[in-house]
């Protein structure tokens, strides 16, 4: 049998295959037949759209093919024929159909619309549905676009550790990694667990961010980025939080907060435009069935400049807007999703950088501003989501950094290597973190993070 042609190739290079005998392999999405002929919609995973296969009773196995259950896998040999009068641009007139694998008749994804809640219970099968085939194709293309954006600008891709002995965010919401017996762990004299007897000789956790390690490489290679899994033990059962997710974290040396925001804006626009160019069928599907204003919004983001406002100005806008919020607004609070969405969706009506946050609600490594109250930090807020990027200029002054750590009761011994970076040719540098899943939610219009992760990990859920 000849080598299979991808359905994607048939759609992208149709003229190369018209009126020729070809072979395709894929899974049956739909099948309808009569006594003399039938139609099969086949998808091979390479393209969002199916291809129609027409077969008739000249096939030796016509009756067997006519009764095949949905999701059975087949190979088809036939002629690709143009169908200008039909919905589809072409079809295959089958000469031979080979059954590769039969599906059971109780296959749960029949031809009807299923709720996302139900599809989460069959996460091992949901990539075969239209919505999730589109979602995970976009996820793949967006991941490639991120690498391409940074590689084209000579950034060094850096792999930071997943197991770490430090807490980058200082929040303490981390998953512990240990080989100690939980029933009978070795104890210190004060009765606490003696982690010196653990595998790594100290308390270790799954990383919440690769940023501190990334700074080491930025101060050697100038411009670097990380792209990998991170973990947060936050018991937040919301549509925006997951215990395991992916982060993109660039770090740039000889750069300040303004440079950081410029990089973030350029990267976001590049990735969105790349996905729009490479996944038009998928985005059209999302625009039709998930978020009817999606394409208009994405085009607006790509073509417009992002707004900028200080945290203090944002608080004043929220206090004067006359809108009743569930969470009161006052200077010093951490902005909630409802505040962020008001700013981006109702006031500015575009993506928005909020800068210069109070130091008390931000991490220890962010550069202290001259006012002594705020830090050179920024969050990028986008309509429909809220915060999607968090970044800052890093504190390069050793004495100021130590003072901040003392304020927050962080041990210098735990961060000795990070502090040492400030001794040997320190310079201003900056970076940000982008939650990859939130980016995919924004590009697709999907509203629940569980639906943009192949196998979501959330409180109480570790199935599959």
UniProtKB/Swiss-Prot annotation:
Entry-linked Gene3D superfamilies: Bira Bifunctional Protein, Domain 2, Nucleic acid-binding proteins
Keywords: Aminoacyl-tRNA synthetase, ATP-binding, Cytoplasm, Ligase, Nucleotide-binding, Protein biosynthesis
Catalytic reaction list: tRNA(Asn) + L-asparagine + ATP = L-asparaginyl-tRNA(Asn) + AMP + diphosphate + H(+)
Entry's localization field: Cytoplasm
InterPro entries: Aa-tRNA-synt_II, aa-tRNA-synth_II, aa-tRNA-synth_II/BPL/LPL, Asn-tRNA-ligase, Asp/Asn-tRNA-synth_IIb, NA-bd_OB-fold, NA-bd_OB_tRNA
Keyword Ribonucleoprotein appears in the UniProt entry: no
Record's GO cellular component terms: cytoplasm
Pfam families, A to Z: tRNA-synt_2 (PF00152), tRNA_anti-codon (PF01336)
CDD domains: AsxRS_core (cd00776), EcAsnRS_like_N (cd04318)
EC numbers: 6.1.1.22
GO molecular function list: asparagine-tRNA ligase activity; ATP binding; catalytic activity, acting on a protein; nucleic acid binding; transferase activity
Matching PROSITE patterns: AA_TRNA_LIGASE_II
Any GO BP annotation: asparaginyl-tRNA aminoacylation
Subunit structure: Homodimer.
Entries under PANTHER family matching the protein: ASPARAGINE--TRNA LIGASE, MITOCHONDRIAL-RELATED, ASPARTYL/LYSYL-TRNA SYNTHETASE
Similarity comment: family membership: Belongs to the class-II aminoacyl-tRNA synthetase family.
UniProt-recorded name of the protein: Asparagine--tRNA ligase
Source organism per UniProt: Clostridium beijerinckii (strain ATCC 51743 / NCIMB 8052) (Clostridium acetobutylicum)
Gene: asnS
């Amino acid at each position: 049998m000849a080598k299979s042609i991808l359905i994607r190739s048939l759609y992208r290079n149709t003229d190369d295959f018209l009126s020729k005998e070809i072979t395709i392999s894929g899974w049956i999405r739909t099948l309808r037949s009569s006594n003399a002929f039938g139609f099969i919609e086949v998808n091979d995973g390479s393209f969002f759209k199916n291809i129609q296969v027409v077969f008739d009773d000249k096939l030796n196995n016509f009756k067997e093919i006519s009764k095949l259950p949905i999701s059975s896998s087949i190979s088809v040999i036939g002629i690709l024929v143009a169908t200008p009068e039909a919905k589809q641009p072409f079809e295959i007139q089958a000469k031979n159909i080979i059954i590769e694998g039969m599906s059971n008749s109780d296959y749960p994804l029949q031809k009807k619309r299923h709720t996302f809640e139900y599809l989460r219970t069959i996460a091992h099968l949901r990539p075969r549905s239209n919505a999730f085939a589109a979602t995970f194709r976009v996820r793949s293309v967006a991941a490639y676009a991120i690498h391409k954006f940074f590689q084209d600008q000579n950034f060094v891709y850096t792999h930071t550790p997943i197991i770490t002995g430090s807490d980058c965010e200082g929040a303490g919401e981390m998953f512990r990694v240990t080989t100690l017996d939980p029933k009978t762990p070795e104890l210190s004299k004060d009765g606490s667990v003696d982690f010196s007897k653990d595998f790594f000789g100290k308390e270790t956790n799954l990383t919440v961010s690769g940023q501190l390690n990334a700074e080491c490489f930025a101060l050697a290679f100038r411009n670097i980025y990380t792209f990998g899994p991170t973990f947060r033990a936050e018991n937040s059962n919301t549509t925006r939080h997951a215990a395991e997710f992916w982060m993109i974290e660039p770090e740039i040396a000889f750069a300040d907060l303004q440079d950081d925001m410029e990089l973030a804006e350029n990267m976001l626009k590049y990735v969105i435009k790349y996905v729009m160019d490479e996944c038009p069928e998928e985005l059209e599907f999302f625009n039709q069935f998930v978020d009817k204003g999606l394409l208009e919004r994405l085009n607006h983001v790509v073509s417009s400049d992002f707004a900028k406002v200080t945290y203090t100005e944002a608080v004043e806008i929220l206090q004067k807007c006359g809108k009743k919020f569930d969470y009161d607004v006052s200077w010093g609070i951490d902005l909630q999703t409802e505040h962020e969405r008001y700013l981006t969706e109702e006031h500015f009506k575009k993506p928005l950088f909020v800068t210069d946050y109070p130091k008390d609600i931000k991490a220890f490594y962010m550069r202290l501003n001259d006012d002594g109250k705020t830090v050179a930090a920024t969050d990028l807020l986008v309509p429909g989501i809220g915060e999607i990027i968090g970044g800052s200029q890093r504190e390069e002054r050793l004495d100021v950094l130590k003072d901040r750590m003392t304020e927050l009761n962080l041990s210098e011994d735990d961060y000795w290597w990070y502090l040492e970076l400030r001794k040997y040719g320190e310079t201003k540098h900056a970076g940000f973190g982008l939650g990859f899943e939130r980016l995919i939610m924004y590009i697709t219009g999907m509203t629940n993070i569980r639906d943009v992760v192949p196998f979501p990990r959330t409180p109480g859920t570790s199935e599959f």
